Curated annotation (Swiss-Prot):
Domain of life: Eukaryota
Gene this protein is translated from: AIM32
Regions crossing the membrane: none
Pfam families: Suc_Fer-like
Family membership: Belongs to the AIM32 family.
Coiled coil: none
Name by which UniProt lists this protein: Altered inheritance of mitochondria protein 32
SUPFAM superfamilies, per database record: Thioredoxin-like (SSF52833)
Listed InterPro entries: Aim32/Apd1-like, Thioredoxin-like_sf
């Protein structure tokens, strides 16, 4: 039984859903700590010698990047492929092979525009079409558009202009700034000048998302834990109707166990409003507790990194 402590949510904008913060009671925490210590020892035994060990006692910071669009480049291959382990370079922008070279090209054409996150993602279920190996098309899923855009490599510049339309008034903390440790965004805005804007149709897929960091070459802790967390989602049948994917680096690799939930609000009205909730120090043994409470509108404070509303 959880002891519930209601707190005021500190966030840049009110969530579309109504959430309460809760804290895990002391007795339950001791049991969780025993499981966590055992799991961390298991993970550390798998890590390369040069990787810093997983330390469950590192304090979880309560901050997330300020953004208004999340662009996911979908990795080719079925869910048993392991691009997150072998194909995603430490820095995705250094990838020269298709399709990942599209990330640096897209970022270049965006010109450092703030408010747009770009990641690679590898789908773990079949609700969205995925590219095949050696596919000539690029598959980008954009949140909160909730649309899959399938484009040619020659369309990247126009696609960047299309994406940037919604970022004109974004704060100046880019995702790259966030990953490099800059905690606060300037409240200034900048003007984006577009050339002729190409409209991209896209195909709508209105489902919630669970994104689990599994970027092995960025930090082996995430690369080892990510598949374990994915397996826990599947074995426990947690949010089985959601899109589930491994995602490249989203910060927080020091403490690892990073999961983003995108929860749609008003999907029946095609409003595309959603809440973005970021968690860290998520382990296979505490994932069920996190998900069950989230489904009931409760956020476990000990794992919460922060969140924003998007529309």
């Amino acid at each position: 039984m959880l002891r519930i402590t209601v707190k005021t949510l500190q966030q840049r904008a009110s969530f579309h859903h109504s959430f309460k913060h809760i804290s895990v009671p002391d007795l339950h925490t001791r049991a969780q700590n025993d499981q966590t210590n055992c799991y961390c020892q298991e993970i550390n035994a798998r890590l390369p010698s040069k990787t810093d060990p997983l330390d469950p006692h590192i304090k979880l910071p309560h901050r997330t990047p300020n953004y208004n669009k999340h662009v996911l480049l979908l990795s080719p291959g079925d869910r048993f492929a392991q691009p997150w382990k072998v194909a995603w370079n430490h820095n995705l922008d250094t990838n020269t092979n298709r399709p990942y070279n599209a990330i640096s090209k897209l970022r270049s054409h965006l010109g450092g525009s703030p408010g747009i996150l770009i990641n690679a993602a590898h789908l773990q279920n079949e609700f969205i079409p995925r590219p095949k190996q050696h596919d000539e098309w690029l598959y980008f899923f954009v949140i909160p558009d909730m649309k899959l855009y399938v484009i040619k490599e020659t369309d990247i510049e126009e696609f960047a202009s299309f994406l940037d339309e919604g970022a004109i008034q974004a704060p100046k903390l880019s995702f790259q700034d966030y990953l490099s440790g800059k905690a606060k965004a300037s409240q200034q805005v900048h003007e984006v000048h577009h050339r002729k804007l190409t409209r991209f149709q896209g195909e709508t897929f209105l489902r919630d998302w669970n994104l689990v960091c599994g970027h092995y070459k960025r930090d082996a802790k995430c690369g080892e834990m990510g598949p374990d967390i994915i397996a826990a989602f599947q074995d426990e049948k947690l949010f089985p109707e959601n899109n589930l994917a491994l995602i490249s680096h989203i910060g927080g690799h020091i403490f690892a166990g990073n999961v983003i939930f995108y929860k749609l609000f008003g999907r029946e009205k095609m409003q595309n409003k959603l809440d973005s909730l970021w968690f860290g120090k998520v382990y296979p043994h505490n994932l069920k507790l996190l998900c069950e409470n989230l489904e009931n509108g409760k956020i476990i404070d000990e794992m919460y990194r922060g969140g924003i509303s998007m529309n």
